[in-house]
C-alpha cells in the first residue's frame, strides 16, 4: 500500500534534468566573488576581501535548493552580512547539480571534496554549516578535528530521534520508495520531482517570514525581491542517487550520526571526540529543524561548556539564512564569536588528524 501511494508521486518515467551538466545557475549572485577551485561535486567560491585573516567556509546544504540560499539578494545575503561583520576571508561551497557521471557520488565523495577545499583554503578553518550542510560539516570536523578551528551549526539536523516535520516525512515513507525514485532517474534524483514532494508551495506570507520583511506588490523593489525568491525556489538541484539513499536511510532513518555508528572515509565517527568550540543557531518557528532538534546536538559533543554557545532567532527555517533581522542580529554575533578569544591553546589549534 505504501509503495502504491509512493508511485502516485513518482510516475514511471525518467525525470527531466533540472539543468544541463556543467550549466551555471541562472539566478545571479548578489555578492562579488571568484571561483577558487572546481571539484567534481562543487565550485569553491571565494568571497574574501583580504588575503590575511581567519578563513570562514560556509557549507551550503546539498539537499534541494542551490547555494544562493546564502547569497539571495542585497540585504538578504549571509555572505554580504558576514563581510559587513568583519569576516575578511570568506568562502562558500556551491554544490553541483548531479550529472549522470555523478550518480554514484556518496557522502564520502562530498567529504573528500570538502577536505580538498579546506586544504586549498589552508587549515584550520572556521566552518559554518547551513541546514543539512551542518551534519556534513560536523562529520568533517569529527573526521579531521585539527582542520577545523570553530564550528557553527545553523538550523542543522543531527539527532533525528528528536522529532521534526522532515524526519517524520522520511520515516513515513518506505526506503523502497526512495530506491524506486533513484532507479527511475537512472541513478539521479530529479530536483523538480523532489520539489513536488518535499516542498510545500510558499505563500506570500511564507516568503515575508523567510525574508523578515513586508513585500508590497506595488513596490518595484518588493516585486523584484519576490521574483528573486521564486526563481531560487523553483530552480532545484538534482542529486546523486547513492548520496540520496545514504542520507534518507543512514542519517534520517537510522540516525547513525547521533548513534555513533556512522563511518566517514573509513573511520567511525564519535561525536564525543569533537571538542572544538561550537555555536548552534536555531529558528524559533522552524518546522524543518525545530530548536529542540537543533540543540540536541550539544549533548552529543565533547566540547567543554564554556565553548558551547546557543541562540534562538525568532524566525522560520529559511529566515536563519536570508532573513533581514537574523542576518543583522544572530549572524553578526556569530561573526563576533568567531573573532573572539576563547583561550584555545596552540596545540589544540594545530592538531591535524590524518
Feature map (PLM): residue ranges:
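Alpha/beta-hydrolase active-site loop
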Residues: 102-120
Amino acid at each position: 500500500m505504501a509503495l502504491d501511494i509512493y508511485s502516485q508521486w513518482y510516475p514511471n518515467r525518467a525525470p527531466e534534468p533540472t539543468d544541463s551538466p556543467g550549466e551555471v545557475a541562472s539566478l545571479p549572485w548578489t555578492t562579488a566573488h571568484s571561483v577558487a577551485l572546481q571539484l567534481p561535486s562543487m565550485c569553491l567560491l571565494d568571497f574574501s576581501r583580504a588575503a590575511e585573516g581567519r578563513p570562514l567556509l560556509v557549507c551550503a546544504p546539498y539537499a534541494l535548493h542551490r547555494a544562493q540560499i546564502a547569497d539571495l539578494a542585497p540585504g538578504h545575503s549571509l555572505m554580504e552580512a558576514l563581510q559587513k561583520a568583519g569576516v575578511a576571508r570568506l568562502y562558500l561551497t556551491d554544490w553541483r547539480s548531479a550529472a549522470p557521471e555523478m550518480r554514484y557520488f556518496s557522502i564520502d565523495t562530498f567529504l573528500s571534496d570538502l577536505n580538498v577545499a579546506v586544504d586549498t583554503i589552508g587549515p584550520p578553518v572556521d566552518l559554518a554549516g547551513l541546514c543539512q550542510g551542518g551534519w556534513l560539516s560536523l562529520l568533517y570536523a569529527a573526521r579531521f578535528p585539527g582542520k577545523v578551528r570553530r564550528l557553527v551549526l545553523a538550523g542543522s539536523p543531527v539527532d533525528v530521534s528528536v522529532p521534526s516535520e522532515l524526519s517524520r516525512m522520511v520515516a513515513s515513507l518506505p526506503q523502497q520508495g526512495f530506491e524506486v525514485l533513484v532507479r527511475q532517474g537512472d541513478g539521479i534524483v530529479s530536483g523538480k520531482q523532489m520539489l513536488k514532494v518535499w516542498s510545500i508551495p510558499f505563500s506570500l506570507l511564507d516568503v515575508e517570514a523567510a525574508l523578515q520583511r513586508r513585500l508590497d506588490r506595488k513596490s518595484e523593489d518588493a516585486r523584484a525581491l519576490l521574483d528573486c525568491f521564486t526563481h531560487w525556489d523553483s530552480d532545484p538541484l538534482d542529486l546523486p542517487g547513492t548520496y540520496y539513499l545514504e542520507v534518507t536511510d543512514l542519517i534520517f532513518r537510522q540516525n547513525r550520526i547521533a548513534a555513533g555508528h556512522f563511518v566517514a572515509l573509513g573511520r567511525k565517527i564519535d561525536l564525543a571526540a569533537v571538542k572544538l568550540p561550537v555555536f548552534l543557531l536555531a529558528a524559533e518557528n522552524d518546522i524543518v529543524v525545530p530548536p529542540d532538534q537543533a540543540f540536541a546536538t550539544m549533548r552529543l559533543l565533547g566540547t567543554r561548556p564554556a565553548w558551547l554557545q546557543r541562540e534562538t532567532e525568532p524566525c522560520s527555517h529559511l529566515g536563519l539564512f536570508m532573513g533581514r533581522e537574523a542576518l543583522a542580529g544572530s549572524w553578526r554575533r556569530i561573526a563576533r564569536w568567531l573573532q573572539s578569544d576563547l583561550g584555545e591553546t596552540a596545540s589544540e589549534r594545530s592538531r591535524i588528524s590524518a
